[in-house]
Amino acid sequence: MRLIACSAVVLGLVVCSKAFAADASHIVKTEARKQGVPVAFALKMARIESGIKCGQRNPRSTASGPLQVLKSTARAMGYRGDIRRASCATQAHYGMKHLAMCYRGARGNQALAKRCHQVGVSVLYSKKNRKKRRG
C-alpha cells in the first residue's frame, strides 16, 4: 500500500516537471520569435544552458533562468532588480535579448553567437573572429 502511494507521488512529480518544461519551452519559443532568433537555435541554447528549466540556477554565479542570464548581463540589457527572483518569462526575455544581440553581431553564425552568449560580447571583436563575422 505504501509503495503504491509513493509511486503515485513520484509519478505526479514527473508529470509536473514535464509540464513545467513544456511551459519553459513555449516561453523560449515565443521570445525567440519576438527577438528574431531562429527557434531551433534558441531551444538548443536553452537546452545547453539549463535543460530548458526555468528554476535552474548556477550556484557559483548569478546566472539563472532557461538561458542562464547573469545579473550583470540583465542589467546591461535594461532590467532593474534581481534577475534571480524574476519570473521565468522575464528571465527568458532578457536572456533572449542577449542571445539576439549575439546572433545579430555574429551575422547569423550560430557557433559564434553561442560563444558570444556563453563567454561575452568581446568574442565578436577578436581578430580571430572578424573574418567569420564578414562572411
Predicted regions span which residues?
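Positively charged n-region of N-terminal signal peptides that target proteins for export
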Residues: 1-5
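Generic marker of residues within folded, mature protein domains
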Residues: 9-11, 59
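Catalytic glycan-binding domains that act on GlcNAc-containing polysaccharides
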Residues: 20-135
